[in-house]
Amino acid sequence: PLAVQVLAIVLVADFTQYWVHRTFHAVPFLWPFHAIHHSVEDMDWLAGSRLHLVDVILTRGLTYVPIFVLGFSQSALMAYVFLVAAQATFIHANVRWEFRPIRRIVATPAFHHWHHSAETDATMSRDA
């Protein structure tokens, strides 16, 4: 079923993207490429689109390879692309909603804003 495929894509992509993102924060050579994304001073819905080309190629490339190798349907892929675009827009939006019931399993705007902040804990961990 389509819903199962979309859920599987979300899980595979989220796992992969999490580790790619952590790598951008942890590897000094890669950080300058990702730092472009963190250079936004006032978060708004377009902040998620502020990316260096190297960041885009590595993140999307490494995230999409397992999705394509696993052979999901075109409909499931299209649904995933829509969901991930909406989610990126939402977490970068100029709101600080916490969504307490789900904030431990889903990145919320409040958490992602903290991740982009200048606080030492946020800038040193950069886990979002």
Task: Map each language-model feature to its residues.
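Membrane-embedded catalytic scaffold of the fatty acid hydroxylase/desaturase
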Residues: 2-128
